[in-house]
Amino acid sequence: MEAFALGPARRGRRRTRAAGSLLSRAAILLFISAFLVRVPSSVGHLVRLPRAFRLTKDSVKIVGSTSFPVKAYVMLHQKSPHVLCVTQQLRNAELIDPSFQWYGPKGKVVSVENRTAQITSTGSLVFQNFEESMSGIYTCFLEYKPTVEEIVKRLQLKYAIYAYREPHYYYQFTARYHAAPCNSIYNISFEKKLLQILSKLLLDLSCEISLLKSECHRVKMQRAGLQNELFFAFSVSSLDTEKGPKRCTDHNCEPYKRLFKAKNLIERFFNQQVEILGRRAEQLPQIYYIEGTLQMVWINRCFPGYGMNVQQHPKCPECCVICSPGSYNPRDGIHCLQCNSSLVYGAKTCL
């Protein structure tokens, strides 16, 4: 095991060189591992990817029901699907002299001239840029004749339309390194180099590395005495593709796809460190990755005012749906919490 030189003052220059050499060797190991990660792997494996949910495609159309309000979900600041003022039974039927009248959450008539909510010639409701305040119950009154000879029929169709956002999801990693003495500045230097290399490794994916924790502890090992170990915890999250260092224009720019690629690169990076150490003929550097200590967890978080609820929103189980009246979410939790005094959609406080 290589160690720092701690001799008399006249050997200070040699001590500095020896200590610097140890840090350099550990850094070189990181650089080589990062380079090898770029080499395509011939081994593939199948995993379950987190699924993004979108209902904003033009091909999706929502039909109503006379029995209950039909739920529809629109991504925040996006165009909505067409909300049809017909039932499934009437969708393909011939309607004579149909007329449509839409009312919004507060009983206001949705006019044809509205810039954000438009009524098509066939009576469909379409939102161009859905805002949080647009969430709520929408009602359409349909009048029509089945045939020219029959009398006018009237239907009332209700829709519960919710804003939703994709979750703020990220990977959280933990790893342990054999370290220099816990009061050594070389542990801090190594930490900085490790984060720099990981950041460069993920630069093309528009992903961000954030250090959550870095602690040095003395660990008693069975049959190995005491040793110093660095405990790292860091997160990997996707940046906005428009704001990242390198703009992502590839067809696989969805955040969860970029995060999955980042996870694979990080796993390979740490595995390469183990392989390189295994091929070394000389002694191990003082700072090195401890095999098998890399752990990761996939974390979903919703923005304040939004939450996931499989029971309430079974058609959008992985969406962060705006909190309904009677609930709120004050921070980046997963679920909306009960609040009887909350009367608005998207509440962030409970008064």
Curated annotation (Swiss-Prot):
Changing G225S: In SPGF66; uncertain significance. One of its GO terms (cellular component) is acrosomal vesicle. Expressed specifically in testis. The keyword Glycoprotein applies. It holds the Pfam family EGF_Sp38_C. The keyword NAD does not apply. It is found in: Cytoplasmic vesicle, Secretory vesicle, Acrosome; Cytoplasmic vesicle, Secretory vesicle, Acrosome membrane; Secreted. InterPro entries: Ig-like_dom, Ig-like_dom_sf, Ig-like_fold, Sp38-bd, ZPBP1/2_C, ZPBP1/2_N. Residues 1-44 form the signal peptide. It is a peripheral membrane protein. N-glycosylated. Changing S184G: In SPGF66; uncertain significance. Keywords: Cytoplasmic vesicle, Glycoprotein, Membrane, Secreted, Signal. GO terms for biological process: acrosome assembly; binding of sperm to zona pellucida. It comes from the Eukaryota. Glycans are attached at N114, N187, N340. PANTHER family: ZONA PELLUCIDA BINDING PROTEIN SP38, ZONA PELLUCIDA-BINDING PROTEIN 1. It is linked to Spermatogenic failure 66: An autosomal recessive male infertility disorder characterized by globozoospermia. Affected individuals have a normal sperm count, but spermatozoa are round-headed and lack the acrosome. In addition to pure globozoospermia, some patients have a mixture of acrosomeless spermatozoa and spermatozoa with small or detached acrosomes, which is defined as acrosomal hypoplasia. Belongs to the zona pellucida-binding protein Sp38 family. Plays a role in acrosome compaction and sperm morphogenesis. Is implicated in sperm-oocyte interaction during fertilization. This is Zona pellucida-binding protein 1. It comes from Homo sapiens. The gene is ZPBP.
